[in-house]
UniProtKB/Swiss-Prot annotation:
It comes from Oceanobacillus iheyensis (strain DSM 14371 / CIP 107618 / JCM 11309 / KCTC 3954 / HTE831). InterPro entries: DeoD-type, Nucleoside_phosphorylase_CS, Nucleoside_phosphorylase_d, Nucleoside_phosphorylase_sf. One of its GO terms (molecular function) is purine-nucleoside phosphorylase activity. This is Purine nucleoside phosphorylase DeoD-type. GO terms for cellular component: cytosol. PROSITE patterns: PNP_UDP_1. The gene is deoD. NCBIfam families: deoD (TIGR00107), PRK05819.1 (NF004489).
Length: 235
């Protein structure tokens, strides 16, 4: 067991999907995994292990934001020796040609989070995805006939901000595709520990147009994203 995960050694696979919403973790396990077993419910953050196409895979909720995902990624790697980690989550689009329900592969993750500045003593480290996972995810999406978007996302520490329009316009000018709250931490920690990581994101709302999905959709749909992530992580 670790501080925030109640699993025993051997109960977590070395390949794991990381949704922020623990109810999405439950949905993924019950919908896509064979014989899923609950290994964690500490703080309501459900974690399951099962098999997908004959390969052992886990799924663990992480909560929202850099501090929360950092706790789970650190413990999954240090206490359970997880090798491959794929975040499956939602994001808000800031490019006009990115649509609600599009799937984005986050090649890099710009951020306003202080975490990396504290770690790197003011240096602006550029967290990026693992290339092998990125390529495999792109190929998996193409095989499904999907039009994937690949590029930079913005990991924000702030969901509500007074100068949001100004920040969004600046980020869009520099070709950032969407805004989310976790990928920078995932990529930085994966680099630190020599692990493979990727964020596969579904656009749940469009910050410019105002189009959005429902809370129920965000919990229990977006199956394209989940299948891409699962097919990628077992390669």
């Amino acid at each position: 067991m670790s501080v925030h995960i109640g699993a025993k050694q051997g109960e977590i696979a070395d390949k794991i999907l990381l949704p922020g919403d623990p109810l999405r973790a439950k949905y993924i396990a019950e919908t896509f995994l064979e014989e899923p077993k609950l290994y964690n419910e500490v703080r309501g953050m459900y974690g399951y292990t099962g098999t997908y196409k004959g390969e052992r895979v886990s799924v663990q909720g992480t909560g929202m934001g850099v501090p929360s995902i950092s706790i789970y990624v650190n413990e999954l790697i240090q206490s359970y020796d997880v090798k491959k980690l794929i975040r499956v989550g939602t994001c808000g689009a800031i490019q006009k040609d990115v649509n609600v329900r599009d799937v984005i592969l986050a090649q890099g993750a710009t951020t306003d989070s202080q975490m990396n500045r504290l770690i790197f003593n003011g240096i602006d480290y550029a967290p990026i995805a693992d290339f092998e996972l990125l390529k495999n995810a792109y190929d998996a999406g193409v095989d499904k006939g999907l039009h994937l978007r690949v590029g930079n996302v913005f990991t924000s520490d702030t969901f509500y901000r007074d100068n949001a329009q100004q920040v969004n316009e600046l980020l869009a000018k520099y070709q950032v595709l969407a805004i989310e709250m976790e990928s920078t931490a995932l990529y930085t920690l994966a680099a630190k520990y020599g692990r493979q990581a990727l964020s596969v994101l579904t656009v749940s709302d469009h910050i410019i147009t105002g189009e959005e999905t429902t809370a129920e959709e965000r919990q229990t749909t977006f199956n394209d994203m989940m299948e891409i992530a699962l097919d990628t992580i077992i390669k």
